[in-house]
Amino acid sequence: MHDAALIIGLVGVLIFAAHLFEAIFRHTRIPDVLPLVVIGILLGPLLGIATPTSFGAVGPIFTVVTFVLILFEAGTGLSISSLRKTYQETLILTTVTFILNVALIGVAAHYLTGLGWVRSFILASVVGGISSAIIAPMLGQLNMQEDGKAVLLLESSITDVFCVIAALSFIDISDFGDITQFDIGLAMGKMIASFLLAAMMGTVGAFGWSYIFNKVRGLQNSMFTTAAIVFVIFGIAEWLGYSGAIAALAFGITLGNISSLRLPKLYSGFNTDFSGLNISEKAFFAELVFILKTFFFVYIGISLQLANWWLIVVGLILTALIFIIRLPVVKFTVLKSTPVTDASMLAIVIPRGLAAAVLASIPFQQGMEGGDIIQNVAYAIILISIIITSLLVFLVDKTRFSRFYAWFFPNLGKQSKAVD
């Protein structure tokens, strides 16, 4: 009974702490993700008060539920006009970044860890992309224009798929033992299908749901029915082998812009008046995501495993390489009209997170030689990238460090106005 009382009390403290960290952010510009992850590390790896096994099967399910709602809620805040303006830029930035990350991190990991080439590229693929689960809840706190936020959110969602397909493909190569037996065309086909069909499912699902939404609103306690539909679409997409994350994001984007989207009437008796989220519903989901992300980031901190100090140093070196790679990629791929502040954020807001943590555990669980090294280095990169991202956001926003990026991006647009 005392343990239950302690846990309930801790839940209340964490919620109050999350609001405090958000208030601190408004003054310091340090994202609240950092102190929440640090709390998790204190409770988990350092003090041993909690471990991922303490949550049993609930922990992984909770992370997926939170991840889905975070993507959906972030999608509702994106405008179609911003997506139209930034999708080409996003695809170029995402693809170039991911390819360079996998190539250079793979080579560096091979020489720093002694892993074989294929296993080094497994590690590189695992940490090759930024985390939508970390970035989506940070967007509202970043000093960026809407177009820049759209680029970050889309990139993080796309690279989650890149990481999954690439990492599993290299694991297949490791199983084959011969790269010539690997079908790269099949892997590319899976990737394209995962994007397009998942996006189609999310979009069609949003139109279908919005058509009956007004009728559902008449039911008692119907606020959470939209979230239920998001879970259904995510589950179906994943079950079919597509990207549930892309489906959830597409659902949110479509539902958030439904008032500006019109389908032609199929026949005169068909009413095409679609309904999106109202103000109270948006506020409900924003508050729900705020509470869930609080426990989500603490859980990530608890889940991190930092057992070998040399591998932590390797993680630090590889994380530094990730940030170095990002600078020239942003410089040569973003539009010339991009404000310097937006380009700066695109260069520094590149944390690793949920997808990397899940993928890093697969080689170890399969008993692959070097699987423990892959997992430990990946966990170190996740932690260090979150810390560096948070600190750089503060430095760029509050100190003269921003002058470095103004110097590095001399040909880009003028700086955008600060956001409170």
Cite the ranges covered by each PLM segment.
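Transmembrane helical cores of multi-pass secondary ion antiporters/exchangers
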Residues: M1-D420
